[in-house]
């Protein structure tokens, strides 16, 4: 089967679901239909956009014999049951992070996926900026020496105001962790991917900095703002707006990260530095084309995205020549291109080049340890 013969469906048509549809179309995948939070809301959105037709339910989508792959981009609480439905129907599946709300469920989904022989992936798309694959290749080749210190941040501002609202603020839909699970999970996955080291212990301090929020009675799109004339309801908040986390990685490397969705002016700012015994690597999502390489005894370097200068595993992600900027939407295309190469061959490669349910499970093990560490205010071991 060729990639342009594959048919897909997408569950969830908010901000991220639409990003999935757009990336799949760039690959030539036929997106047959979508499922929304309700058929009525989905039809209204389809009528005002270029989205495909609406299916009544995940079961109906999974039951369509024409569909080969289903993407789950719905609110977090729905992932477990929806992924099970898709796997039971014999469809390949791509799920947004977090894979599920707890490690028991992620372990179950991982086992089901592995025993099914179906392609399974978790959408840790930030790995797929080419600079981040280049960083991974440099670390793996020993160019920076053994990683010693891994630091950084993931900051946003879209939940700064007490009138900012989204389903992610509701624990019954998003889980008890919010900033850590929503965006921190990307950073945790990314730094383990680059360093080749899993996180083994954590010490976390989580903060609810906006204790009471005012919101409309109905749903609010991700990153949307509330109109001044809207009648608002007050609700107490319990999930984390921000976090500071100390980390210990395999092999002895130490780490520290701050995570925030209430940092004014930071729209979607991801940063890391991996300091090794020879040199250091650094990257910032605001300048995604450039990888910083720091040296002690000679001039520092900025390695810009260029397929002729990058390692093979990084250059194959690049769709345009150097100097033609690629960004956030391109990470989905790059990730899905690797997933769909396996779909086209009928099943997962022996060593997939994309994050699988095993990676999704491992990140939830880490975030579970972060939640426990904050509750108990102590160092906590990741339970593998």
Language-model features: locations:
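Beta-loop-alpha module in the N-terminal Rossmann-like domain of NAD(P)-dependent dehydrogenases
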Residues: 49-112
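N-terminal Rossmann-like dinucleotide-binding module
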Residues: 1-49
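Hydrophobic residues in well-ordered beta-strands that form the structural core
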Residues: 95, 120-122, 151, 283
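Predominantly a Rossmann-like dinucleotide-binding segment in NAD(P)-dependent oxidoreductases
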Residues: 126-236, 291, 377
